[in-house]
Amino acid sequence: MIEFVFMLTHHDRTVDRPADVYRGIRDCGLRYVGFKDIGASVADLREVCDQAHADGLEVMLEVVSTSKADELRSIAAAAEIGVDWVLGGTHPRDGIAVLAGSKARYCPFPGTVVDHPSVLLGEIAEIAESAREITALDGVYGLDLLAYRHPTADVAALTSAVVRASAGPVIAAGSVASLEQVATLDAAGAWGFTIGSAIFEGRLPGGPAIDAQIRQVLAAAGQA
């Protein structure tokens, strides 16, 4: 089984009126829901977080800001909102300091991450070594791996190498758009994966209905 995180996001931005979207899928059987630090106000994100917590879900915020200052502001906002997980970011030591005293599980990006939407660069061995170094830090729980955002790497080989190197769970995020990709990530040992854009575009079985697609993905992930 692999964990599915439904992201209330499209093109690396939180969708408009995310709380309204969440209310439409709250009965699908999800365990995890997430959003990005770009595209919605802190108040909107807090509303989603509070509703999801009331429904028994864990909440993830993924940081995709491209500047260090914006990244750290987003991590601070995540702590203020009260999310359970903070994903992404490229300055783990600074992120650890910002999250000091928070209960959020911190999972930064391994490797070299550039641009928005985010792209992962580097050789597999380099990314795996980055994974080892980052998860050795006190205050890092796991990793947010942009497995399908690497322009050339074999996704299965990349994910397997990072999973082996990591001292914590690996969540594969970005551009997951098919059940075949989910199976690849599961076989490679990823703890979980995120899907947002592909569902909002109706590209999964059950589409275009968002709730039907979520149920299909949950079944493929072994959570139905």
Give the positions of each predicted feature:
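Alpha-helix N-cap and loop-to-helix initiation/capping positions
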Residues: 13, 17, 40, 70, ...
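Catalytic cores of alpha/beta
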Residues: 68-80, 122-129, 157, 161-195
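Alpha-helix boundary/capping residues
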Residues: 25, 189, 221-224
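Conserved N-terminal beta1-alpha1 strand-loop-helix module at the mouth
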Residues: 1-59, 66-69, 75-82, 132-138, ...
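Conserved anion-binding
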Residues: 56, 64, 68-151
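Glycine-rich phosphate-binding active-site loops on the catalytic face of alpha/beta enzymes
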Residues: 81-95, 138-150, 175-176, 181, ...
